[in-house]
Amino acid sequence: MIFQEVPLNVVLTIYSEDIDEDYIYGKIVMRNEEEVIIAQINDKGESDGYLYLQWEGIYRIDYESSYEEKIERLYQAKNQYHEELMFPKKEDTLLKNLLNWAFCEKKIVSIYFADSDMEVEGYLKNAQGSQIAQVDVYEAVF
């Protein structure tokens, strides 16, 4: 199966070498030839933000099994939703669009650096995502 042909807005189990977990649940909301944005759902069926991945790191996608159906039922039963991604201006990559959206909407981002196992959480200081005002678990900026 070609991953880019997986249906949009259907609960999936995604396996990628670019995430710390063994797998994640979510719905693909945007994609192009190289990138994908996933509306992530935790194992309790709750909205868990957006996740950006590149297709090259994804090695398996499951959908329409009893696991994904259970997550979908929980998601609906808990009246969960993901805020619609409205990109103010179209950039050349989904990553740039997502960072620009997070900056404009003042969303907290978590950025993982796979090559160093480092993670940074905070608010973007600019739309390019090159500067982040880090926050702690209480959302205090430091």
Protein language model annotation of sequence segments:
Residues K27-V29, E34, A39-K44:
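N-terminal beta-strand/beta-hairpin edge segment
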Residues R31-V36, Y63-Y67, A127-I132:
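Short, conserved beta-turn/loop elements at beta-strand boundaries and strand-helix junctions
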Residues D22-M30, V120-A127:
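Short beta-strand-centered aromatic/proline hotspots
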Residues K27, I37, Q54-G57, Y123:
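Residues located in well-ordered beta-strands
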Residues M1-Y23, I41-E119, Y138-F142:
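Short glycine-rich, low-complexity segments
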Residues K125, S130, Q134-F142:
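Short, intrinsically disordered, charge-balanced linker/junction segments flanking boundaries
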